[in-house]
Amino acid sequence: MTTRLLQLTRPHYRLLSSPFRKSSIIQRQMSASSPSPANSYLNMITKSLQHNLQTWFHFEPNEIDIIESPSHFYDLLKSKISSSQKRIFIASLYLGKSETELIDCISQALSKNPDLKVSFLLDGLRGTRELPSTCSATLLSSLVAKYGSERVDCRLYKTPAYHGWKKIVVPKRFNEGLGLQHMKIYGFDNEIILSGANLSNDYFTNRQDRYYLFKSANFANYYFKLHQLISSFSYQIVKPKVAGNVNIIWPDSNPTIEPMKNKRKFLREASQLLENFLQISKHNQPISPPGQFSTIVYPISQFTPLFPKYNDKSTEKSTILSLLSNIKNTSISWTFTAGYFNILPEIKANLLATPVTEANVITASPFANGFYQSKGVSSNLPGAYLYLSKKFLQDVSRYNKDQAITLREWQRGVVNKPNGWSYHAKGIWISSRDNNDSDSWKPFITVIGSSNYTRRAYSLDLESNALIITKDEELRNKMKGELNDLLQYTKPVTLEDFKSDPERHVGTGVKIATSVLGKKL
């Protein structure tokens, strides 16, 4: 069959008629200069990926940057907002109620540039929890009131599970357990930041996360279209009828019925639009001469709440499982991290089954858990995650991987105390040994984005991530530096620590609640 050429902006794109050709081109590009221990793994993983993923983007050196700290993330956000010319599009769980400086920064950008448009997508339950007091919705409403919804399009996604008796019975403090808009996308013109961080003061100061900046118009366009699609399944903040109020509507322009009116029809319409987006995206395949591009990035997402139960077209879970199941020899290592350590059983099983000689799991110490010494029921969450860590170590022992897989707790001071930090990073790194140093591992694959790889991430929430595969030595060194920066605040934890340290004792009630409510954590 002949191949048709689709003319777009650089990098070039081509429509592919054969999935086998698609896979072989990527293999030639990546394996030609890849570190030799990783070649066979790369060949296997690219064959596997082509069955599941329809879209990828090629990057040249210096088109991906890793942001080092919360303060750098905040400074970069403000800088990008101020310099944006055409569009700012942001997806986050929530906007902190004290973030007036960020709102002012956006307002100033809109004032000085009449061509600029701003799009926000937040979670509708988390973003309105404090109403009528100050909250995400009231802050965004002030922008809409000043500039109008034509220039400031603010959307609030509400899970379709928030319906019927659940809407009436479940208190505001707990309704987030039904499902959330959890994507973290920060787009500015032709650049985009993918992260796990939200928009509040702790994420800008002392809450450890990860942040990658991608400089590509095509990549930014993809996430902008994704942002707009999920926004079209969401409520909109429009100009209030009374100054200071918040006016939230379901726009007639939305392509689906309001979920509160007909949940089944909403899911049918939304899932079809999502499936169309994921399928149409297969036509955006960047192809170039072998070796020209050093990095390939695959967007992967999880939209389980919007798909029928047995017809989930999401791409994240299957991709993560493929990454891990294709590790077949000891020349590959991995590091896994999640601040909220309630790992999906299938992912855990795949991690434990890998034939690694050295691998790390990084999770938050109880003293770095954002719920440490919080009020009410949430004060039990650090204990719940501690219990899950112990169960993981028991599984490691059961698999006879005690010498190969190390659980490490991250701690930097004590959260909510002077100079104390919390831990919110999540991700996966897959590494090979550096050819120049037989004792050193260097990543050539990482996953960056919003997912905590938990049971709820694959059942209740909307997640978006990116899988990066690279042979760019500078980027690999940056990835290694990022990982080392996290590891420097960790210490290994063993089953013996749980036996000897009374502070690691978890009560029976917390254990039972963790087992019952595990899907919500």
From Swiss-Prot:
Main location: mitochondrion
GO cellular component labels: mitochondrion
Pathway the protein contributes to: Phospholipid metabolism; phosphatidylglycerol biosynthesis; phosphatidylglycerol from CDP-diacylglycerol: step 1/2
GO BP terms, alphabetized: cardiolipin biosynthetic process
Family annotation (SMART domains): PLDc
Subcellular location: Mitochondrion
InterPro entries with a match to the protein in the record: PGS1, PLipase_D/transphosphatidylase
EC number(s) given by UniProt: 2.7.8.5
Reactions catalysed according to its record: a CDP-1,2-diacyl-sn-glycerol + sn-glycerol 3-phosphate = a 1,2-diacyl-sn-glycero-3-phospho-(1'-sn-glycero-3'-phosphate) + CMP + H(+)
An annotated Gene Ontology molecular function: ATP binding
Chain positions recorded as ATP binding sites: 91-98
Keywords, in A-Z order: ATP-binding, Lipid biosynthesis, Lipid metabolism, Mitochondrion, Nucleotide-binding, Phospholipid biosynthesis, Phospholipid metabolism, Repeat, Transferase
Domain PLD phosphodiesterase: 177-203, 419-457
Keyword Lipid biosynthesis: yes
Transmembrane segments: none
Active-site residues, Swiss-Prot/TrEMBL: 182, 184, 189
Function (record text): Essential for the viability of mitochondrial petite mutant. Catalyzes the committed step to the synthesis of the acidic phospholipids.
Family classification: Belongs to the CDP-alcohol phosphatidyltransferase class-II family.
Name of the protein: CDP-diacylglycerol--glycerol-3-phosphate 3-phosphatidyltransferase
Gene: PGS1
